[in-house]
Amino acid sequence: MGVAALVAGCSANKQVSVKQSVENPKMMIIAKVSVKPDKTRDFVAAAREIIEKSNKEAGCSFYQLYQDPYDNSRFVFVEEYKNQTAVDAHFATDHFKGFGAKIGDLVAGPADIKIITVAAEAKK
């Protein structure tokens, strides 16, 4: 399944629910994406909008895109949300729902998407 199909699937009212820690309900999404080598600039340009808008969501702690320094066609989205409710709210946004259509012709293969919870972190 490609990123576009996965994004479209999530926006089609599929609930992604994960058992959360009572002590720390934070959730992270790690999405690894392979992009067609000649489409990396277009992909980054398309990603900027979802990054900017997602970072303004009340429940989003951060939403960033990283690029593999050894293979410029490989990218990783790293997202952190305050809880499951924030993840669900993100999946319901127009910018999330529209992202799949924007990148459908840019991706080279299936995405690897993981939703994880925080197991331990430094006390502040």
Task: Describe the function of each predicted region.
Residues 52-76:
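Short, glycine- and small/hydrophobic-rich beta-strand elements in well-ordered beta-sheets
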Residues 27-44:
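Mature N-terminal segment immediately following signal peptide/propeptide cleavage
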Residues 7-9:
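C-terminal motif of bacterial Sec signal peptides marking the signal peptidase cleavage site
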Residues 11-28, 65-71, 101-124:
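Glycine-rich beta-strand-turn "strand-cap" elements at beta-sheet edges
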